[in-house]
Amino acid sequence: MKIDGTRTQDRAIELVLDYYSAFNRGDWPGMQALLADDVIHELNEGPREVGLPAFAAFQQRMARSYREQLHDIVVMATQDGTRAAAEYVVHGEYIADDEGLPPARGQHYVLPGGAFFAIEEGRIGRISNYYNLQDWIAKVRG
């Protein structure tokens, strides 16, 4: 018999995997359904955004400028299921200029990334994304 903590841990891992599965399908509403209404989204080298409307605006910016798929996703979670971490490899194409970044010319890139999650009442309450922005810039500049 498994202790409850292990099942809670499994649910946290499944939640994060569901989030990334929705991402890879381009299912923005599906991603949002997994988030708390007051979700905190901490962008790599960017501002902290709070709430589903801010997250939806972020998704629109991403969809306009990038086509991305995440591969080799590995998710770990605390036994109590309140925290999780993910590591992945981003395979992307830069399709339209994003403010403050080099011009887009359909450049392809592959780079590692990761994220940390806080999970509250079965929903994602915080996402902190990390990747090497300078590495990405070097890849798209060629």
Question: Where on the chain are the PLM-derived regions?
Answer:
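C-terminal and inter-domain tail/linker signature
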Residues: M1-G142
